[in-house]
Each structure stands twice: as C-alpha cells, then as structure tokens.
Amino acid sequence: MGCFITFEGIEGCGKTTQIKLLEQHLAEKGFKVLLTREPGGCPIADQIRAILLDAANSAMTPSAELLLYAAARAQHVEEVIKPALADDCIVLCDRFTDATVAYQGYGRGLDLDSIGYLNQLATSGLKPQLTILLDCPVEVGLKRALARINGISAGAREERFELESTLFHQKVRNGYLKLAENEKGRFLIVDGGTNVDETRVAVTTAVIGRLNGN
C-alpha cells in the first residue's frame, strides 16, 4: 500500500502552493505520486465542487453543504484515492475529512458526531497517515485569498467561503487547532505565515522523515 498525506488550513494559508511543491520534490526523488483535491478530484466530485464553491449559491443550508461534501468524498475515495494507494502511490490530497469537521462542524456549528458518521461512511474508515496543517492568522490568509480571487475572471471564481465573515474563519482556524491537539501523532502544524521557501523546507523535511519511518 502507498501513503496518504493530506494538507489542511484556512483560506489563503498556502497549502495549495505547498502541496504542489511537495509533489514536485517527491517526483524528483523517484516516488510515485498522485496529487488530488477536495471537493473534486474526479468528474462527479468536480461537478459537486462547482455547486459548493459558487458564490451564487448563498442560500445553501449547512446541512445541504455537509451532505454534498460527503457525496463528493465518497466518489473521490472509491474512484481515485483507494486505487492509487493500492498501486503504491503517495497520495497528496488538498483537503479531506478534517476540513469538513473544521468548516461544517466548528465553522457552521453542525453536530460533530453526525459529521464523524458521514465522514466514516464516505471514506469507509480511510484516514491519512500524515496531515500537514498550514496555520496562519485569519487576516493574513483572507488577504492572500482575496488577492488571488481578484486576479481571476468573475465567471471562474470559486469564492463562496472566502466571502464568509472573519468570525467564521476564526472558528474554522480554532477547529483545526483543536483537531491537531487531539491527534498529535497524525498532525504536523507548519507556520503558513512565513515565506514560501521556509514553509517548503519545513514541509518536505517532515514528509521525508515520515516516509523514512522517523
């Protein structure tokens, strides 16, 4: 079996940049790597992603949002992640079940036990061996995220979460930190507020160490 590594964090924390840099580094070292993301990662899940991240869908209820994430994840896990792991790939996933706990649980206030049940159902119990949490202050993350969005044409923007309140994003950040505190063996918190290269070194060092059994 391969190795399953996830990246988590608030909007603008730098995880998408760092996961791509890690993919490149591991590929150069000769590892077989698959980079994927949630929501999305396969055609059906990508269609659900378009619904979830469209700012025009502001009337979406928290429960509907949660169930859509679970549906996208169930398809993604069976179609993409499990086959790649069975093929001895290192699977790098930009967000996974922890994002649902942080955003829909701590951010939206939905019941954590219900979220846990849905995550279990959608993944058949699959959990990452390592989760990199890129942590940064909410103000820093949102400034980066909004700057990125403003550089994208209006019709291609995925901005429903970026437009949420600062309080919402603070709840999400706090949720992530609680998750990391509760599962110290799986989580690695990396400062996402530093420059890209410093963060890259911290991430690659940790991942190579984990792959080498350290």
Curated annotation (Swiss-Prot):
Signal peptide: none annotated. One of its GO terms (biological process) is dTTP biosynthetic process. The keyword Kinase applies. Keywords: ATP-binding, Kinase, Nucleotide biosynthesis, Nucleotide-binding, Transferase. InterPro entries: P-loop_NTPase, Thymidylate_kin-like_dom, Thymidylate_kinase. It comes from the Bacteria. HAMAP family: Thymidylate_kinase. This is Thymidylate kinase. The gene is tmk.
